[in-house]
């Protein structure tokens, strides 16, 4: 009768909650600073008085006094009998010697909402007996999961550490990237198992490597557009040299030395092979000239001369068009009174270094074939540079 009377007066819920028990201990209130616990202080004191079987120690002492006085007013007497329980059970949570409590359903729901319920589950699994259950579980079972959870939140909120790849792993990944910029999933799994990496690490490494390759390619392309390299210039001269390596025809009028223009068609090729050759004006009334850079004092020297202000260059007449950087504007012959031409001896020295097939082609007005031109350009590249006089 006493149990039913106190249930109707003190407890609205059908099952008592452990949160009501927490309000009666000052030590627990100091350690637990959540708002939900503070709001629950208006709820009556713990349920050991209503269910004495859960706490046999307090039931033997507080129960006889409550049975005598609950007939007059049960609610007031329960508030009076609460202070003795504070002094009796206050040292028990601090000692930590009490075993842990049984796990209730509301505890399971609270832990399932958290990310890592394993520490709380292991603490609850170590419960031995239900004696002094509420007070023991208050300190050991509820405070430690909260502290552990706070530590886990700090760890998960921190930045993930970078993967430290070994030299062997980097070498294998670079080799694979050289052949395949994109990996299919079976190959990615195979590489991850081979290099002792996770599939995610291999995928992220290839993503970063593709971005690095893209940046390098874009930067290299921008540099190519701004300033062409020497290899590109060499290719440009090779492409323009067939036009200048064609055999020359002698024009009837305005030709100072017809035989020289026939026997020295290679001077135009030397002009093209030198990338920084300067344009020179034409001589005479020819409409289709061919440039040739030759200094005054170095008539006997091999090719690759560089024209200077003291050494003006000469222009031979011919049918083939000159390179793009040569001038085609005609000028009067009187503007260049002291021009020296290639002598036949220097042309013969140049032609001696060439193959016999090229020597025969020099004498004929027929254009060079592709094979002769390839051999001609290779011979120009292998001329001894020790005899050059700049």
Swiss-Prot record:
GO terms for molecular function: DNA-binding transcription factor activity, RNA polymerase II-specific; RNA polymerase II cis-regulatory region sequence-specific DNA binding. This is Homeobox protein Hox-B2a. Residues 40-73, 81-100, 108-155, 211-338 are annotated as: Disordered. PROSITE patterns: ANTENNAPEDIA, HOMEOBOX_1, HOMEOBOX_2. Disulfide bonds: none annotated. Sequence-specific transcription factor which is part of a developmental regulatory system that provides cells with specific positional identities on the anterior-posterior axis. Plays an important role in the patterning of hindbrain and pharyngeal arches. GO terms for cellular component: nucleus. Its main location: nucleus. CDD domains: homeodomain. It comes from the Eukaryota. Belongs to the Antp homeobox family. Proboscipedia subfamily. It is found in: Nucleus. One of its GO terms (biological process) is regulation of transcription by RNA polymerase II. Keywords: Developmental protein, DNA-binding, Homeobox, Nucleus, Transcription, Transcription regulation. Residues 158-217 bind DNA. A motif (Antp-type hexapeptide) lies at residues 103-108. InterPro entries: HD, HD_metazoa, Homeobox_Antennapedia_CS, Homeobox_CS, Homeodomain-like_sf. Residues 52-73, 263-290 have a biased composition (Polar residues). Residues 118-135, 244-262 have a biased composition (Low complexity). It comes from Danio rerio (Zebrafish). The keyword Transcription applies. Gene3D superfamilies: Homeodomain-like.
């Amino acid at each position: 009768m006493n149990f039913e009377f106190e249930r109707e007066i003190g407890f609205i819920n059908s099952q008592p909650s452990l949160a009501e028990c927490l309000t009666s201990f000052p030590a627990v209130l100091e350690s637990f600073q959540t708002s939900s616990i503070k709001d629950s202080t208006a709820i009556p004191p713990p349920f050991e008085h209503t269910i004495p079987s859960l706490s046999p120690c307090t039931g033997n002492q507080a129960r006889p006094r409550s049975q005598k006085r609950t007939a007059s007013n049960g609610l007031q007497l329960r508030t009076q009998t609460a202070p003795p329980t504070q002094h009796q059970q206050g040292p028990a949570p601090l000692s930590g010697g009490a075993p842990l409590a049984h796990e209730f359903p509301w505890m399971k729901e609270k832990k399932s909402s958290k990310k890592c319920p394993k520490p709380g589950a292991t603490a609850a699994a170590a419960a031995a007996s239900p004696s002094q259950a509420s007070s023991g579980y208050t300190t050991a079972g509820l405070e430690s999961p909260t502290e552990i959870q706070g530590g886990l939140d700090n760890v998960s909120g921190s930045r993930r550490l970078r993967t430290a790849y070994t030299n062997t792993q980097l070498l294998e990944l670079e080799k694979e990237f050289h052949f395949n910029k994109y990996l299919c999933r079976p190959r990615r799994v195979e590489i991850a198992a081979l290099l002792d990496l996770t599939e995610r690490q291999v995928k992220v490494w290839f993503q970063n490597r593709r971005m690095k390759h893209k940046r390098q390619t874009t930067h290299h392309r921008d540099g190519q557009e701004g300033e062409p390299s020497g290899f590109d210039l060499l290719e440009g001269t090779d492409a323009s040299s067939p036009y200048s390596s064609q055999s020359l025809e002698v024009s009837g009028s305005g030709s100072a030395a017809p035989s020289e223009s026939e026997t020295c068609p290679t001077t135009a090729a030397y002009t093209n092979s030198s990338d920084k050759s300067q344009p020179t004006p034409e001589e005479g009334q020819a409409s289709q000239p061919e440039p040739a850079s030759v200094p005054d004092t170095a008539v006997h020297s091999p090719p690759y001369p560089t024209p200077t202000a003291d050494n003006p260059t000469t222009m031979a007449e011919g049918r083939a068009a000159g390179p793009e950087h040569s001038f085609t504007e005609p000028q009067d012959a009187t503007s260049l009174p002291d021009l020296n031409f290639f002598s036949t001896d220097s042309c013969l020295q140049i032609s001696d270094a060439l193959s016999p097939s090229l020597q025969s082609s020099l004498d004929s007005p027929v254009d060079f074939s592709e094979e002769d031109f390839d051999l001609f350009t290779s011979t120009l590249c292998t001329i001894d540079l020790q005899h050059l006089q700049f």
